[in-house]
Amino acid sequence: MAEAVGAVTLIAAPARRRWLWSALAAMLGLLTARISALEVHTPKEIFVVNGTQGKLTCTFDSPNTTGWLTTVSWSFQPEGTDSAVSFFHYSQGQVYIGDYPPFKDRVTWAGDLDKKDASINIENIQAVHNGTYICDVKNPPDIVVRPGQIRLHVVEIDNLLVFLVWVVVGTVTAVVLGLTLLISLVLVVLYRRKHSKRDYTGCSTSERLSPVKQAPRKCPSDTEGLVKSPPSAGSHQGPVIYAQLDHSGGHHSGKINKSESVVYADIRKD
């Protein structure tokens, strides 16, 4: 009998050693594996009506496939406190709920690790559930994680309706003001363009293309007297003699002489 027990012990010893070596190799592989960052995504805040169900949405991104080693933990930090209490844990397909009274028989799993979803539902939310919820996911070798945080506000139905009305009114007002401003700017631009075209009177095409020739003007000399004949034979006015006045300022000036015709003598017949 003793020999049989000794044989069983000798047979079990190698098997135990192999199991230990396998476990050590697995742990060593986890320690030496590449550690990559896992990103957790949650909404910043949600509003839930008192007495209804609230869903705490939590998703994550990981380059590694989820499996039995993937875990999800939820913690709660009540308003006015600095410490968080863990009240939910999910691992290997099992849900573990703590004894924290505000969440007893209220929390259910609503996620799917294959879809990288770690969400939960809370039934019959009350004012005591106001606070910050923390979603922490581990997916080895992704263990460097910044947990996601959700600020939950429990509101009464009347307050929620008032809040929604103000949101709608504010949105509609902003849209109306924006459209009014845009239409006003368009009308101002069109008005300015229309009046700028009306005020500008340019020459026609024919005027721009047709050259205008002016007859050369004869400038009398300084010593030349011009005699203008009377306009008609029946007039009693005699010939008018014009003289040129030189305004050049000197006979040797290099400037162009400017002359002016004045009446020198008016001979009339009585």
UniProtKB/Swiss-Prot annotation:
Motif (ITIM motif 1): 240-245
Positions bearing Phosphotyrosine: 242, 264
Residue spans crossing the bilayer: 163-183
InterPro entries (UniProt xref): Ig-like_dom (IPR007110), Ig-like_dom_sf (IPR036179), Ig-like_fold (IPR013783), Ig_sub (IPR003599), Ig_V-set (IPR013106), Myelin_P0-rel (IPR000920)
PTM statement from Swiss-Prot or TrEMBL: Phosphorylated on tyrosine residues upon stimulation with pervanadate and concanavalin-A (ConA). Phosphorylation at Tyr-242 and Tyr-264 is required for interaction with PTPN11/SHP-2. Dephosphorylated by PTPN11/SHP-2 (in vitro). N-glycosylated.
Family per record: Belongs to the myelin P0 protein family.
Protein name (record): Myelin protein zero-like protein 1
Provenance organism: Rattus norvegicus
